C-alpha cells in the first residue's frame, strides 16, 4: 500500500497490537528502555513488527512511543539515533507485506502549563524534534497515541504540521466516564484534532472493546461521515493479580464485531494484544467499508471540558473588553490578571456560555497581552473564548495558545482582511465571525450587508473553513444615532440565515448606547433578533432581563425541550422585590456554582476564591482575614473546607483535574500568606503529618504522583518526594531514617507491579511502623489488597482522604 492510497481503501485497515506486551513476553528487563532495543536488538523488534504484518496489520507502529528527550534522559543513544533505527526496523518488516511504517509518538511524560511546568512552545519544539527525526528516517505517517491532555496533543499536531507533510493519526485515551485523565470529552477531542489538521482520529488504550464502543460511536458523530476514525482497545482490563489482561483473542474479536456498524477507517489493539488478536480481526472486518453516511455537522465551540453546540440562543459574555471601561484599561496596563479573571468568573456564574476576550487598549502591547490573558482565563474557566481583535498578530498569538476549538472575532469584507485572517482560522481550526462591512464602511441597506456577508462566506469556504464554522455579524447600530437603520440589521440577519446557511451573531447592547433605561431597549432588540434567526448574542449575562428573554425564547421555540434549562434556572427564583429585601439583610455568602449549599460568614470570599482557582483573590482575602483571625483558624475554617468542596466536586465529576490543580494553586497562595504571618510572629508552621511518595523501581512515569504531592501539600502534609524509578532499599531507608508512618507508592505499567509488591514486602520485612497506600492506572482495589497495601487510592483526592483519616485531621 502506498501512502497516497491510505485513505482510499475499500476495507477497514488493520493496525497492529501491543509492542510492550510482546517485549514483556520476550523478557524485557525491569526498568529497561524499550526504544533502546531498536539499536541493541534490532532483530527482536523487526521480528515483532513482522509478526503483526503477517497477521494482517497494514499500518505498523515503529518502536518509538517513548522516544522523547525527557524519557530518554541518560540514554547512551540520541533521540535521532533511536528513531532512525526504529523506523528502519519497521520498514524492513513492512516491505514484504506492503504495510506502512508509522512514527509512533506518545506523551512527553510532563504536564504542560498551567497544570505543570512544561511551557507550551517547549512542548511544540520537543515534538518538532521527534517529527523531524521520523520524517528524515523515512516514516510513512505519524501516529500520535495515548494522549490524555488535549493541550499536549495540540502541541504535537502543530509540530507535525509545521515540520512535515506526513499524514497524521491522532488518538486519545479515555476513562470509563467518557473523559480523559484531564477531563477532555470525546467530542472536544474530535473537533479540535480535526481542526488542527489530523488526518484521522481515534481512541486507544485504557479500556477494552466493550467499554470503548460507546465513546467511539460518539467520536464518529462529532466528525463528518467521511472523516476517518479508528480504535485500538486494550485486551480488556488488567487482571487483579497483575498477570496481564482478562480478554482472550477470541473474546476480543467477538467484542469488536459491533464496531462494524461504525464503518471505521482502521482498527487494531493496544495493551495486552498480540498478533493472534490482530489475525482474528481479519474475519471481523472483512467486507467492512470505511466511511459513514453524511450527517449535518453542528456548529460547535469547545475547550477540553466544555463542548458548546450552538443550537438555540448562545450567550457570549461581553465584559472582558476595555472599551469605555477605565478600570479595565488600567488593569490591562498593569497586567492585573486577577481583575480580568474576576470578570470572567462573574460572567460564568451569571450564565454566559462563551466569553468574548478583547484586550485592545491605549498603552497596551496587544500581541503580547492576548496570549497571557487567554492562558490565564483557561486556567480558571472552562468556557470557550471568542478572541476579539483587529490586530492580526494578537489573534495569531492567542490562537496558538488556546486549548480547544477557538473562535475569532473578526474579519470583514475587505480583501486584505480576509487574506490575513482566514488562513489563521484554517491553521488553528477556528470558527470565524465575519462583519458585514467593507472598505466602504457600514452600508445602510440590508441587501448590501447581505452581499458583503456572501463574499465573506464564499472566501471562508474557499479557504477550507466549513460552513458550520462561519458566523455573520450584520452589525448593531445605535438607535440614538441611526434609528432608521435598526430594522435593516434585523432584516439582513434574517436574509443571511436563510440565503447563506450560516450562523449569526450580534453585539446586542450597542443598540441602546446613549439612551436611558438601556435594558428595555436591549431586551426588546434581542427578542427581535432572536426571532429573525440570531444564534449568538454578545451581551452582558448579568442583565437579568436579557437572560430571561433568552431562556424564555428557547422554551417558546422548542429549543429547550421540556423546559429543562428554564426550570433549572428559575424554579427557585423569588420575586425581585423579595430578593432585594433578602439581599439587604444577608451576610456575605459563597455559592457553589453546581447548585450546592451556600457558605456564609467571614470566610465565604476566601472559600470562593480557592474554589474558583483565583490565586490573587485568595492571597488578598487571606491577608484581610489575618488582620483579625489567627493563621490556623483561617486554615481550618476556610482553606481546608474549600479544598474539601473542590475535592467533592472532583469526585462527582462536576469539576476536573485542571480545576482541581488550580484550586490547589490558589490555596497555596493563601498558605504562603499564612506562613509569612506565622514567621512574623516567630512561630513554627506545624505539619499535619509526614508522607513519603515514590514511583516504584522500573517505572519512569510520575505525573500522577506529582499531582498527589500537590494536593497533599495543600492539605498541610509534609511530603518527601523520592521521585520515579525508586529502588526498594531507598524507600525502606527513607521511611526508617525520617521516621515516616505513611507511604504512597505509584506504578503505571503492569511490568512494574512486581516492583510495587517487592517494595511493600520490604517495608513489612523491615518491621517499620508505617501504612501504605498505592495508586496507578493499572492497579485495582483487589490487587492492592493482594500485595499487602493498606489502601488503594484511585486518585489524588482519595490520597488526601486517606492521609486525613490516618493522621486524624
Regions found by a protein language model. Name each.
Residues 1-473, 477-809:
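Domain-level signal for soluble alpha/beta catalytic cores
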